[in-house]
Amino acid sequence: MKSFKRITRSLGMLAASAGAMLAFTGPSSAQETFKVGIVTFLSGPAAESFGVPAGKAAEFVIGELNKGAGPAPYNKVGFGGMKIEPVIIDENGGATKQVQELRNLYQRDNVDAVIGYISSGDCLAVAPIAEELKKPLFLFDCGTPRIFEEAKYNYVFRTAAHATQDNVGLIRYMKMKNIKMDTFSAINQDYAWGQDSRADFVAAAAQLYPNAKLGADLLPKFGAGQYGTEVSALVAAGSDVVYSSLWGGDLQAFILQSVPRGLAKRSQLVLSASDHVLPPLGDKMPDGVIIGARGAYGLMSPKTPLNEWFFSGYEKAYGVYPVQAAYRVTQSILGVKNAVEKAMAKNGGKKPSTDELVAAMTGSEWQSPGGLIQMKNGDGHQAIQPIAFSRTKYNAEKKRIDLVDIVNFEAECVNPPPGVKAIDWIKGGMKNDKCK
């Protein structure tokens, strides 16, 4: 718990010192700031490997931007010369609590925008509230495709691709690497993320592995922590492949409980969103596991000056390399910066109104440490992006898990085209012209 409090305090200090840092560049008032709520798990099972790295990344990136120390094109101080004033909130506590916390951020703390939410259940709950209040909300991580498939929003954006890319990409990777899958089993959390991930994987498998049979199909509750019964069922099933979208503390617990019982030797483990557990698990993660990171992140990230700035800076600051949640909150912050400065270029350098910010973000694109982000889907409110997959291999010299057999997929190869529901696109054969 000490680490969570330290992050909260340091972000609070960052916010308090915003006005005392380097002088602004640009026509915006010297006293003007851009106040942004940041919501991530700082406690609970989703914190250690997921929420806290996101909080640390927000701290690092906002600190660098407020000093004007970002690489081009992000080298203007803050957002268009305005210092960024963060207000960080713990996402732990459930959807009802997060709805009230979001209202508090807008109505009590008077934030200009909110960047947040890892849980798909939380995203589904808070998106209508932002729309009701007519306030900008930038969802940085949650994966359910339902956000923009079941509703239309003007003030809500998701600055990262949804779960369809994780599962379509995973199946494409498996086929490319000639992974045998006559039979497969699945274990996913029983809420929006796990249900939607499972549906996408099963549907994609039907396209590229049409004869594969589904065996054990398990849906433990989020935060279950104990998987003895489930591991027994998976070992007994003896499937060629065990697929899972488990994440955070649940995934760590599953690996620690299943590996000693030989599951990874009996079946090929394929984990759609798992790079974030590599640092805490270390050599407890077996070799040969196929993993995704929900993007081209961490040890699968591109070699660019922007990624070098982020990867090296984060690693130097915190003693560990950044993983998916850190990348996803960073691309959201940079996306908002891009939109704010785009709006200011149009309005003569003034702090943009909500409507100006919304217009600038809709359909925009920007470079991130993980590659190009394009707001192409959801009427310009839903991002698509590149993604990478690989296998685990322990590096005894570095005393860490490395990733080998890395394959990158372009965004259009693993995401549905505009106006098409993800599951319909998958069942229609995942047609596109961007796959090699």
Annotate each PLM feature:
Residues 2-15:
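Bacterial N-terminal signal peptides that target proteins for export
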Residues 22-30:
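Sec/Tat signal peptide C-region and signal peptidase I cleavage site
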Residues 37-61, 89-95, 118-119, 187-196, ...:
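Extracytoplasmic "Venus flytrap"
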Residues 56, 96, 111-218, 266-292:
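Extracytoplasmic ligand/sensor domains, especially the bilobed periplasmic-binding protein
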Residues 56-86, 206-212:
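Signal peptide-proximal N-terminal region
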Residues 88-112, 176, 226-238:
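Short, well-structured alpha-helical segments in soluble
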Residues 258-331, 341-347, 402-434:
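Extracellular/periplasmic periplasmic-binding protein-like sensory domains
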Residues 364-436:
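Solvent-exposed, acidic/polar segments of extracytosolic/periplasmic ligand-binding ectodomains
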